[in-house]
Amino acid sequence: NEKYVVTVFMDITCHYCHILHQQVKEYNDLGITVRYLAFPRAGMNETARQMEAIWTSKDPVFALNEAEKGNLPKELKTPNIVKRHYDLGVQLGVKGTPSIVTSTGELIGGYLKPKDLLAALKESAQ
């Protein structure tokens, strides 16, 4: 049912990222596949180290879901993958989270409800 793929730069401490993540099934039901990249808004700090532990865990989806419930990783890791995600975000002009990048490279800053994102994706495809 995939019609669109978006990449979301997110931070595990971001309120609107939490809302977006809670609605990921609604995005999927509308044909929008959501992929995540880490973008710790405060740079390479403790949050970045927590995000690295999530992204490098044996089951990153489970680890992210747990973090979204407040169960943050106990083990912190040096942010290598997260640093690459962050640097890419900076190059693309990401200034905050969530930031949504479409498959055509368009940057949508901020949270959009599932139906609003679908409308924006349809409009940009024309």
Question: What do the predicted segments below correspond to?
Answer:
Residues 30-33, 57:
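Short hydrophobic alpha-helical module
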Residues 17-20, 82:
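Aromatic/hydrophobic pocket-lining residues that form the small-molecule binding cavity
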